[in-house]
Amino acid sequence: MAASPSTDQFVGVLRETIVALVRRAGPDLSARQLGVFLTCYLHDGPHTVRGLAADLNVSKPAITRALDRLGELDLARRKVDPADRRSVLVQRTPKGTAFLRDLRGIMGEAAAGPKKAAPGSLRGG
């Protein structure tokens, strides 16, 4: 039976992934922005500012600031909910989908072994 990955291995994959994100061309995402991005892309929607704030246990203004940045980078967009005009829906974008695909590749390379992740392989945004 194969041994399960240790906490240190998970931390190593996280480090290699973050290093690759920092080294790539283009802007960085903060931890909060990345958390909002991943929540929108990995969990089924629809997503709202209110729902994201509750899911991540942060304030609605903090979610709004993160979405402002994700919108500037075309990684997510906001749209008024036609069913409830007081609510704003967060939508995925093609550029965000490509970023997630690249991020998965970087994480896979990092998980395969130390120093195997290509630092510049994520596209800049």
Describe the predicted segments one by one:
Residues 1-28, 125:
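N-terminal leader segment of winged-helix/HTH proteins
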Residues 82-103:
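Basic, amphipathic "hinge/linker" alpha-helix immediately C-terminal to the N-terminal HTH DNA-binding motif
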